[in-house]
Amino acid sequence: DNKYPATAAEYLDRLKHWQAAIHTDGFSFDYHLMTFPYGGDPSFLKISEVVYEDMKGLKTVGLNGNVSCQLQRLLLPTSLPNYAMAAALVGGKTYAETETEYFAAAFGKDGGAAKDFLRKSESFYLSDAMRGKSDDKSELFRAIDDYACALDEISAYPFAPSGETEKLSVKLLKRYVETEKAFLSTYRAKCEGRDITAAREKLFGFIDEGEPEYERFEDALFKKDGVKGWL
């Protein structure tokens, strides 16, 4: 039977038969951090938790590691996805503990504020209104308004980074916030039925202009492809 597996159950069934026939080491090869972080939830929080849980599940199915087929420049707004992957593979903390540890290390005393904002960003992108599960336009515009308020609040937050790590973390978060503001205004215009051709080009121009400074942390091409999915 050369039919390619289509579900997790089918993959696990094949793995079980393979392990019964060949007694050797094994690992997974997966794509968590390829395109989803930009086209799904750019806050990186949901994918970080998914990565963590999947890595923790490897031992359950008899696998000893993971080859992550992913973007190399995946550090904006945070490096949490990679941190969570490593922590799950070699550490003993829960995901919640890992997440708290990361934000404290990256942002110092401002870790709570950074995490709270990104949680609001996650909630916006994973809301029923944004995922097309609700036809209620008023619900969509409420979600947009709430997110706009969250962006304004974090923009006004008095970050006080101490040390190079915290300074870089704040810089990358602020870049994310500015990009999200440009995106949200364009997305609102689209939802209102207005022509967004010029606004979209301005947004993409903003991403391109920042590439020389942020290319070590974000892949501009994939970022724009993710944004196009919403616009």
Segments from the language model and where they lie:
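Alpha-helix capping/termination and helix-coil
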Residues: 22, 59-62, 106, 110, ...
